[in-house]
């Protein structure tokens, strides 16, 4: 899934 505040990274 995609997570992070301003950037999307794999969790």
From Swiss-Prot:
GO CC aspect terms: extracellular region
Family of this protein: Belongs to the conotoxin T superfamily.
GO-annotated molecular function: toxin activity
Disulfide bridge map: 2-11, 3-8
Keyword Secreted: yes
Domain notes: The cysteine framework is X (CC-C-C).
Free-text tissue specificity from the UniProt record: Expressed by the venom duct.
Compartment list: Secreted
Keywords: Disulfide bond, Secreted, Toxin
Primary location: secreted
Species of the source: Conus araneosus
Protein name: Conotoxin ar5a
